[in-house]
């Protein structure tokens, strides 16, 4: 399992297009991806990173930190791709 924390840099956070891009990458990878928002140093309940609706329910805003768990074949590559999406400044 590959785990990492990353600060979301998109001006809209993980909403709409960034959430859709994150979920699409997670789904197409074939890996199990779990995503949590970090609040006061503690991760919230994890959601399915391959579900755009679940990702959006976290309410991740620009500057928030997220905790991501990726498990499965190709987890290193999937984790790297998800980190790029989270750190993108595009909305």
Question: Which sequence ranges carry the predicted segments?
Answer:
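Conserved beta-strand core positions
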Residues: 4, 31-33, 66
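Compositionally biased, low-complexity segments enriched in small residues
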Residues: 3, 50-53, 74
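Compact, glycine-rich, soluble single-domain proteins
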Residues: 9-53, 57-60
